[in-house]
Amino acid sequence: MNKKIWALMLVLPLCVFCGGKDNPEPDPDPDPEVKAEIVISGEKEFDVAYEGGSGTLTFTSNVDWTATPDDAWLTVTPASGKASKSPVAVKFTCGENPKLKNRSTYIVLSGTGVEKNVSVTQAGNPMAGAAAEVKDGDKVLANSPLVEKFLTEVTYADKTYKEDTKVFDYYGGFDGKNLTWDNWETDWPDGDKPESYSIRWKKEDMESGKMSLQLSDELGWSGTLEIADGARYVNITNLVPNDKYTFKVTTASGKVLTQGQFTTTGSIHQCFFSGDIKTKSGVTLKGEGARNCRDLGGWKTLDGKTVKYRMVYRGGRLNEKWTPYPLNEQGQKEVLFEGIGAQLDLRGNSDVIHEPAVAGLDHCSPVIEQGGKTMLVNDAAKTKECFEFVVNSLRKGKPVHFHCSLGRDRTGTLSILLMGLLGVREGDIAKEYELTYFAPVGYSVSSSDKKSNPTPIFKNTRKEWVYSDVVPYFWELAGDGTFAEGVEKYLLTVAKVSQQDIDDFRNLMLE
């Protein structure tokens, strides 16, 4: 009995000792938890010139880190590193800012449990959007080089409109090979637009306030264009070929920033008036503005005269019932700068607008549903109204822009009539007519034709539709006479236009 008691007494202290190990006392000096830190030791905000450049940001990091620019226009090196007590240097680089406005982004420095941002702002490019520079003494091409190649290489004989067309031999339009419904908005070569050039001046010569451009030519045209405060250049376009221009840019105080003269070459006076530019997924799309516009001037007649420039223009719509409108505010100013004073709208009931696209223009909209011979015969009274509006506008010294929706069928019909009456050779009228091939969707081919024209291909050559409908009609009226005589006979006997209006039109248009 005593032995059992003694054994129990020996075991109890051991149990107490073992139980004590299950609940140890806390360590009086534990290791402190390390906080993740990135400490920027240099600049936290950087400014870069518009030309591009680089900079270096320095920091320390007690964790592995990455450096990531928030936009693709900025690159960094190195892009990652290990934790270190020593300072780290990361270099960032960017190219020239392609836009007029400043652009800003961040370089994100991050590691497990920590993130810091460093801002980078690049100045806007004052030369963004500047066309190729034209200087005193330069000689430049006025119209599109694509159109120039076609006009200088192709010759059509009279009365051969049923034989062939050569326009598909030239890049720049819907030939069924190069452009599709899907890629035209990004790949369109803009062959219907004239060449643009920029007049530039030195930054150190500038003064605060708006500036102005005075531009004039040897033909007697002149215009003044306001230039925004701080601008370093002004773009000019819609130049007449084979002309001499004088330019001068002045400040509000009258100080001359730059001046000079240049000459132009080319075959046709193309025009473009600005509209709002559209983008898709950051890509600039083609087709904006008032398109398919060209002057009827410059063509030679059979009796050795020349059609005057800046009198009558043909083109696509200047306004419409839906947005975006062809012309923006800048485009409206460009119409007036060109000197256009009257608008003839040939559209039908579905899309005609009975008011001018630009405030102050004289306006006429007779409502014509279809071009071709139908327009000439069934709508002879309205064709007469169109002709009289053109003549009366010219009498008042107001150049006319006439258009339908695309500037193709009804516009083409009236263009054939006007050029034919002036005595331009029919084969040359065919070349002028086919220039619509170089215009984008909505002008050369209709966007509503996707199902019937899936390739797509331009279907309004001289062999088809309007041209092959109107021209033989005028030739038939001419009998053994000239094409001009056939057109005049139509105006006198069918449209009932007065001989006085015909004579005045020729006198006003020819030199």
Identify the meaning behind each predicted range.
Residues 50-54, 87, 191-199:
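Short coil/turn motif common to extracellular beta-sandwich-like domains
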Residues 62-91:
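Surface-exposed binding patches on compact interaction domains or structured appendages
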Residues 51-57, 97-106:
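Short, solvent-exposed loop/turn segments enriched in Ser/Thr/Gly
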Residues 36-67:
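Solvent-exposed, low-complexity, repeat-rich "mucin-like" stalks and linkers
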Residues 95, 110-114, 250-254:
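Beta-strand-rich extracellular modules
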Residues 90, 101-113:
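A short beta-strand micro-motif common to beta-rich folds, especially ectodomain repeats
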Residues 22-25, 127-400, 414-511:
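Cys-dependent protein tyrosine phosphatase-like superfamily
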Residues 14-18:
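C-terminal motif of bacterial Sec signal peptides marking the signal peptidase cleavage site
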